[in-house]
Amino acid sequence: MNHIQEAFLNTLKVERNFSEHTLKSYQDDLIQFNQFLEQEHLQLKTFEYRDARNYLSYLYSNHLKRTSVSRKISTLRTFYEYWMTLDENIINPFVQLVHPKKEKYLPQFFYEEEMEALFKTVEEDTSKSLRDRVILELLYATGIRVSELVNIKKQDIDFYANGVTVLGKGSKERFVPFGAYCRQSIENYLEHFKPIQSCNHDFLIVNMKGEAITERGVRYVLNDIVKRTAGVSEIHPHKLRHTFATHLLNQGADLRTVQSLLGHVNLSTTGKYTHVSNQQLRKVYLNAHPRAKKENET
């Protein structure tokens, strides 16, 4: 990559607080774009709209999903927007390109019984389980992103208000409450997990060496929990975020409150979590529809 692209990635990291996982995706998109430029003997600075259309066709020819193509085009559009702020002679060749429609999907989430099984797995009386339980409790109790989790400092925890202050996207702070189970797990962890007691930094979640845990480390921990849990086959940090939102909405929380807790700027982003299970749909229907209520009472 050239120095402009490297500066762009650094800006996303420092000023927009992008996670390492998201930055890796942006970097991969730029590398693939550079390979196309080299293959077609094109220059970054003279890349035109017709070239952008050809690149779109090139991506589809590689049998990529529409969501992947959409993200890659969005990356390049954002990159050229950044470059335009540095050089007034630059034109964004992707600005008029028709954005491929994203495929609609329902976010995956865990049922309450599955969450109970996961928590039962980390009930073991071991030092590692103390740490693993805190990770699971915080992700499920607060719905925070994994990038927010790994950056929590000890002083961000408020035991008086029972909540945590996290730094979200765009370096925006928000306070997210947690319950008694989460509070207890944090207290036990701080009191009995030896690596956290001997470290020389303020990060809350650490690995077994006492070093601040990485996003990759969190994913490893979650995968390890799943391997030891019967009846649960797949897990990732965002699935716990989906679960947090889904369970709140299923229990009657309003969309605006969930939006605030998740740190979403747009309500439409939170709206994708309004899917509910068939069982919940029937429960609401029976309790709300006049004739259904009468039928339910007989």
Curated annotation (Swiss-Prot):
InterPro entries: CB, DNA_brk_join_enz, Integrase-like_cat_sf, Integrase_catalytic, Integrase_recombinase_N, Integrase_SAM-like_N, Recomb_XerC, Tyrosine_recombinase_XerC/XerD. Gene3D superfamilies: 1.10.150.130, Intergrase catalytic core. One of its GO terms (molecular function) is tyrosine-based site-specific recombinase activity. GO terms for cellular component: cytoplasm. It comes from the Bacteria. GO terms for biological process: cell division; chromosome segregation; DNA transposition. Residues 1-84 form the Core-binding (CB) domain. It holds the Pfam family Phage_int_SAM_1. Its main location: cytoplasm. The keyword DNA-binding applies. SUPFAM superfamilies: DNA breaking-rejoining enzymes. Residues 105-286 form the Tyr recombinase domain. Keywords: Cell cycle, Cell division, Chromosome partition, Cytoplasm, DNA integration, DNA recombination, DNA-binding. The active site is at R145, K169, H238, R241, H264, Y273. It is found in: Cytoplasm. Site-specific tyrosine recombinase, which acts by catalyzing the cutting and rejoining of the recombining DNA molecules. The XerC-XerD complex is essential to convert dimers of the bacterial chromosome into monomers to permit their segregation at cell division. It also contributes to the segregational stability of plasmids. Belongs to the 'phage' integrase family. XerC subfamily. Forms a cyclic heterotetrameric complex composed of two molecules of XerC and two molecules of XerD. This is Tyrosine recombinase XerC. The gene is xerC.
